[in-house]
Structures are given as C-alpha cells and as structure tokens.
Regions:
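Asp-based, Mg2+/Mn2+-dependent phosphohydrolase catalytic module
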Residues: 1-8, 69, 92, 96, ...
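N-terminal helical cap/lid subdomain that shapes the substrate entry/recognition surface
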Residues: 2-92, 111-114
Length: 206
C-alpha cells in the first residue's frame, strides 16, 4: 500500500542525547520520585526498570504514578543545545525532502518545542506533534498509535511509522496496522529496515 504520511519517533531516530547530562537527569528524577539518594544501587535498579519497560523512561515514571507527560516535563527543563545532537547531520535536509512528497509528523514521549529548533528543524514542518501526554499513556502503550491513525485521517496501512526500538516503536505500531520502519538496525519485526535516514526518502519516493 502506498505511503501517504510518515510519522517519526524522536529519541535515537532524529537525535541522540548527551549521555552524561541525560544520565544525571534520569537518575536524579528517579531518586526524587522514590525519595532516595542517587547511589549505585539506585542506578542498577533504574537500568533494570528501563529494560522491563522496553526502553521507555516515560513508562517507568508512569508506572510510579506520575502523569504521562511527567518525564517530558523534566526533559523540557534542560538546555536542548546541550542535551541533544542529530543522529546524522543531513536529517533536516532529508525531512524537508520527504515533506515535499508526503506529510510528516512526530510522536515522542518528550516535548519537542525547544529541542527541534536547536537541531535546525522547524516544528512547522510537521503536520502533527503528538506527545505521550496528549496520547494518554506513554509508549509502548498503543494509545498514541491509535491517535496517529485518527490524526492522519488515513487507513493505518497508508501510514509509515519510523522508530529505533522494536518493543517500544515497531510492535505497538504494527498492533494498530501501521507500516513500520526500524532505523540504524535491522529487525524482521519491521516492514522496512533503514541503515541511514536518507533511505526513508528513497522508500517514500517510489
């Protein structure tokens, strides 16, 4: 089925985080919620939870009773120029090329209003900017993926969702019938595997 709309994940699809700054924020946030100091035991516990929650930090805090957008709000307090860097330098150019062919949108567990401009990406390029707070539950819950279909006003099979984590991105997207693409790795679970970001343009151009 022809692709008529492309939706993107953000973290480790469009941009990666500064590991040191990100680690500091996630451990301190976890310690704050639990009322415990940051120590090696807490860090190990967090990393175990990260695996159990399919690499979704938002879902960890959601499971601890925080609202769906709580982790996004913590991330939004940081300087995006220090927190994020593009996965590939030509991503803004490629996004512009894709949007000349089909609409593009973004679904992320974090708020992107400040992060995107810091990376040379204009929020106005995207038809929709969907957050986990808007969806109701963070990924990997399917809520946001059903919302993608609603917002796109298309059949699920006409929408391509691109992300980097099988359990958090690919499987819930497939659950609602979206076409799926995994980036920077390969997986038989996804309909497409992209070695580099520009490969997405090649697919949409067909």
């Amino acid at each position: 089925m022809k692709i008529k709309h492309v939706w993107f994940d953000f973290s480790d699809t469009i941009a990666h985080t500064n590991e040191q700054a990100h680690d500091k924020l996630k451990y301190e946030s976890y310690a704050k919620v639990l009322g415990r100091p940051v120590d090696d035991g807490l860090k190990r516990e967090f990393e175990e939870a990260y695996e159990a929650h399919h690499h979704s930090i938002s879902d960890i805090f959601f499971s601890l009773g925080r609202p769906a957008g709580w982790w996004a709000e913590q991330m939004a307090t940081q300087d995006p120029a220090e927190m994020f860097a593009l996965m590939e330098p030509d991503i803004p150019e490629t996004l512009q090329s894709i949007r000349r062919l089909v609409p593009i949108s973004m679904f992320s567990n974090i708020m992107l209003g400040k992060a995107l401009p810091a990376l040379g990406i204009e929020p106005g390029w995207f038809e929709h900017m969907l957050s986990s707070k808007m969806a109701g539950r963070p990924k990997p819950a399917p809520d946001g993926f059903y919302k993608i279909v609603e917002l796109s006003e298309l059949e699920p099979g006409e929408i391509l969702y691109v992300g980097d984590v099988v359990a958090k991105d690919i499987l819930p997207a497939k659950q609602v019938g979206l076409q799926t693409g995994i980036i920077y790795r390969k997986s038989d679970e996804a309909d497409y595997s992209f070695d580099k970001f520009a490969d997405i343009l090649g697919l949409v151009s067909k």
